[in-house]
Amino acid sequence: MDLKLLNDQGQAATFSAPDTIFGRDFNEALVHQIVVAYQANARSGNRAQKDRAEVKHSTKKPWRQKGTGRARAGMTSSPLWRGGGRAFPNSPEENFSQKVNKKMYRAGIRSILSQLAREDRIAVVDTFSLESPKTKLAAEKLKALGLDSVLIITDTVDENVYLATRNLPHVAVVEPRYADPLSLIHYKKVLITKPAIAQLEEMLG
């Protein structure tokens, strides 16, 4: 698979990328599965409701068991009563995680990268570095490359690059092992350094 190789001025040449990573068929069902699993595994428990033991209530029986003609009632915390506890309350300990085995996950990442390559959403650079941790420098460099919304995948995240890009709203910098399926799909472009491609090939090939 041929990808665009950009220099610092944004001028393009051709880079021959491995077909094992960038030349696979698109498997929509698999990609959907790993994206949903990734989102589910990122969820944190923040829902809480009270059951009948946790709501504030009196243990006094509202009325006697027999003789009133009304339905029997034991206490006001019953889920049947207004203000009572929930029968099956949501809990912050609820587990939303979904398991995807490594073989499927790697195949899904290869499928995403291949589709991005076909859509011309991947570009390659030799390296990506900055002289100082200035956001202005990072913005100017990305503008010269013709990139605004971009996921930068580099073999090692340079401290200057990290500090300079962290305040840019549509830019993220990650190492190959942290390139998740949601980020790959989310950004308009993916910029990969040559050493990072070698790492991806080793991880996914």
UniProtKB/Swiss-Prot annotation:
Disulfide bonds: none annotated. Keywords: Ribonucleoprotein, Ribosomal protein, RNA-binding, rRNA-binding. The keyword Ribosomal protein applies. One of its GO terms (molecular function) is structural constituent of ribosome. Residues 58-69 have a biased composition (Basic residues). GO terms for biological process: translation. It comes from the Bacteria. Residues 43-95 are annotated as: Disordered. InterPro entries: Ribosomal_uL4 (IPR002136), Ribosomal_uL4-like (IPR013005), Ribosomal_uL4_dom_sf (IPR023574). Residues 48-57 have a biased composition (Basic and acidic residues). The keyword RNA-binding applies. It holds the Pfam family Ribosomal_L4. One of its GO terms (cellular component) is ribosome. Part of the 50S ribosomal subunit. One of the primary rRNA binding proteins, this protein initially binds near the 5'-end of the 23S rRNA. It is important during the early stages of 50S assembly. It makes multiple contacts with different domains of the 23S rRNA in the assembled 50S subunit and ribosome. Forms part of the polypeptide exit tunnel. Belongs to the universal ribosomal protein uL4 family. HAMAP family: Ribosomal_uL4_B. This is Large ribosomal subunit protein uL4. It comes from Bordetella avium (strain 197N).
